[in-house]
């Protein structure tokens, strides 16, 4: 199963981008052995519309252009379901085992995600009750994807 991260906003050069890239590189090296291949990061620009609803709609349209037919869409949103790392890994393992070819994890802009994306989503997850800057969310999801691969492969990176 190919895994992609779609994000509203561009991650500028710096330590956040470097750390996210480090976890993505680890994921890309270890995932294929268990059927999880990192595909790509798609970044779309933030809308400049004057109101939040229009911005969310425009950003969703930009993200949807890159969404393959039949892709499983997982949204990251503060109102989503909280999972621990083993449950997160299990979700992806189950999707892989069910024959899904493409998985997209979407990170919204400052205003969140448009309802059109919620209608297409298989799951909506949160990264806890705290509010995180988008740069940190990118690091957190990259690390959790790598952690999920290590859990599914029995690697000792994740310890309970």
UniProtKB/Swiss-Prot annotation:
Question: By what name is this protein known?
Answer: Ribosomal RNA large subunit methyltransferase H
Summarize the subunit comment. Answer: Homodimer.
Transmembrane helix among keywords: no
The keyword Transferase is assigned to this record = yes
Question: What is one Pfam family matched by this protein?
Answer: SPOUT_MTase
Q: Which UniProt keywords apply?
A: Cytoplasm, Methyltransferase, rRNA processing, S-adenosyl-L-methionine, Transferase
Question: What is any one of the record's Gene Ontology cellular component terms?
Answer: cytoplasm
Q: Known EC number(s)?
A: 2.1.1.177
Q: What does this protein do?
A: Specifically methylates the pseudouridine at position 1915 (m3Psi1915) in 23S rRNA.
What are the recorded GO MF terms, alphabetically?
rRNA (pseudouridine-N3-)-methyltransferase activity
State the compartments where it is located.
Answer: Cytoplasm
Catalytic reactions on record: pseudouridine(1915) in 23S rRNA + S-adenosyl-L-methionine = N(3)-methylpseudouridine(1915) in 23S rRNA + S-adenosyl-L-homocysteine + H(+)
Q: Per UniProt, where does S-adenosyl-L-methionine bind?
A: 76, 108, 127-132
Q: What family, per the record?
A: Belongs to the RNA methyltransferase RlmH family.
